[in-house]
Amino acid sequence: MQQLITQVDANSEQYQANFTHHDKLRQQLRDRVAEVAQGGSERSRQRHLDRGRLLPRERVRRVLDPGSPFLEIGALAAFGMYDGDAPAAGLIAGIGLVEQRYVMIVCNDSTVKGGTYYPATVK
């Protein structure tokens, strides 16, 4: 296989500035995705657990083949909208393996406004 030759100078000021900038953006993205993955408020999540119910992301995890990946899409839908009360627009959606077949999974997050839809949920 032919090797691709780069002309990027990893020691240049511009490279270092770009690297630092994009590293901050990467960390910001990770933080936002982790925040959204919490679902609704702590109170809502606790009420869910007190009723003996699984949290929505746990339900999704249990449907998937053990150890298989889940490619979530739309995790940042409605981010910064609705006063921050709509993580992932109240919906967990993605592609995963069930019985070794790729499937699309859609799960209403009942910890977010009881699982009701926001306008951004259907966009």
Positions of PLM-derived features:
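Terminal-region recognition feature
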Residues: 1-123
